[in-house]
Amino acid sequence: MSFRIATRKSKLALVQTDYVIDLLALKFKMQCEKVLIRTEGDRKLDVSLDKIGGKGVFVKDIEKALIEKRAQAAVHSMKDMPNELLDLFEIIAMPVREDVRDVFISPEGIKFLDLPKGAVIGTSSIRRAVQIKNLRHDIEIVPIRGNIETRVRKMKEEKLDGIVLAAAGVKRLGMSEIITEYFNPFEFIPAVGQGAIGVEILKNSEYASTLGKIDNEDIRMGVEAERSFLKKLQGDCHTPVGAYSVIEGEILNITGIFQVGNKLIKKDVCGDKWDYIALGESLGEKIISG
């Protein structure tokens, strides 16, 4: 019997799952099959995420497949994962992290700072909206949901001046040519876990030892530092919060943003990468204290 991996049905989710499947085939000669799940977040594209339960809407139906033994593992975008998992589950591996940056896509190829006054940009991310406004107070923000292809289509149909997306998704779909420009990740802070793929299993799974061998330690430490920062702030998809971690040698640097009232606070900390959880918490405390 083949090893079953639960995943969303979107083209991007399938590309990410195929990456894990290829890795398992290469390292362990495992035969895998995909179990396709249409999540609540995929079904309710006309409703904002904060109204249907936040990030968990992309995860709960997939985790149900693990509980019901329809799949032995699941592949997720780490930025979609709730800050705290149920005790039943664990992220056993984070094998890869693509480009963490956000990108601006303009149908006319106009760069962000060159847009006309009052230009209209589509995003349903509060984090992106706040940072767009921080850079250009005159920009009008309109909500836009759906997969990458859908959002690009809506941008053209609704005659928007542009949209902001995650570079990782655009690149994984082989659509880099539509990118007008990349935002500097130190100036336009990405979402927690952006670009990282996570493999989730039930705790005490018989496959834990094998799947753990595809984990990338530095990627995990960086993402977990960002997640501990988010947890300290009790942030979620309703909150303008972002974090960006970089590991150089044994040093981890993490930069975070959080909006308090109308003020966008940005801080950073650095230290020994093995203290990644404490570093994330320290950054949260630093931002809370102003």
From Swiss-Prot:
NCBIfam families per record: hemC
The family this protein is said to belong to: Belongs to the HMBS family.
Needed cofactors: dipyrromethane
Keyword annotations from UniProtKB, A to Z: Porphyrin biosynthesis, Transferase
Reactions mediated catalytically: 4 porphobilinogen + H2O = hydroxymethylbilane + 4 NH4(+)
Gene name tied to this protein: hemC
S-(dipyrrolylmethanemethyl)cysteine PTM positions: C237
Organism: Clostridium kluyveri (strain NBRC 12016)
Domain of life: Bacteria
Gene Ontology molecular functions: hydroxymethylbilane synthase activity
Cofactor note: Binds 1 dipyrromethane group covalently.
UniProt subunit comment: Monomer.
GO biological process: protoporphyrinogen IX biosynthetic process
Protein name: Porphobilinogen deaminase
This protein's pathway: Porphyrin-containing compound metabolism; protoporphyrin-IX biosynthesis; coproporphyrinogen-III from 5-aminolevulinate: step 2/4
Other notes: The porphobilinogen subunits are added to the dipyrromethane group.
UniProt xrefs under InterPro entries: HemC (IPR000860), Porphobilin_deaminase_cofac_BS (IPR022419), Porphobilin_deaminase_N (IPR022417), Porphobilinogen_deaminase_C (IPR022418), Porphobilinogen_deaminase_C_sf (IPR036803)
